[in-house]
């Protein structure tokens, strides 16, 4: 029993860390319209039960009543902020942490959110 409980605690912690930045948008259905799709914030249409990645590094799901989106970006917080800086790489949807004096050298990161 303790093993199961411990496993659930670890799983819940992992899920919390992975889903740190999510949001929901209502899926605007027009009464009498039988189309099964979602319209994102840019006006693009997506089939029901589909998944896509936005240019803002969110992963979104088209559900029947809503669009669910979660950030794919982990933000570094455990690093030497006096000597290092974080740089966002849009094309990879990730941060790198480098030395301020020599941006060719990476810094150690001990914690991400």
From Swiss-Prot:
Predominant localisation class: secreted
Disulfide partners: 22-70, 38-62, 57-93, 60-69, 84-107
Gene Ontology CC terms, in alphabetical order: extracellular region
Residues annotated as signal peptide: 1-20
Coiled-coil zones: none
Subcellular location: Secreted
Keywords assigned by UniProt, alphabetized: Disulfide bond, Secreted, Signal
InterPro entries assigned: PSP94 (IPR008735)
Family as reported in the entry's similarity comment: Belongs to the beta-microseminoprotein family.
Designated name of the protein: Beta-microseminoprotein A1
Source lineage: Eukaryota, Metazoa, Chordata, Craniata, Vertebrata
């Amino acid at each position: 029993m303790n093993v199961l409980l411990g496993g659930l605690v670890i799983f819940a912690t992992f899920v919390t860390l992975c889903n740190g930045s999510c949001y929901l948008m209502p899926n605007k259905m027009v009464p009498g319209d039988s189309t099964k799709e979602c319209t994102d914030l840019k006006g693009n249409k997506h089939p029901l039960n589909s998944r896509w990645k936005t240019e803002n590094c969110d992963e979104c799901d088209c559900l029947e009543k809503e669009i669910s989106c979660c950030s794919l970006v982990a933000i570094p917080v455990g690093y030497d902020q006096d000597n290092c800086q974080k740089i966002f790489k849009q094309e990879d949807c990730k941060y790198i942490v480098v030395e301020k004096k020599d941006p060719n050298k990476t810094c150690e990161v001990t914690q991400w959110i």
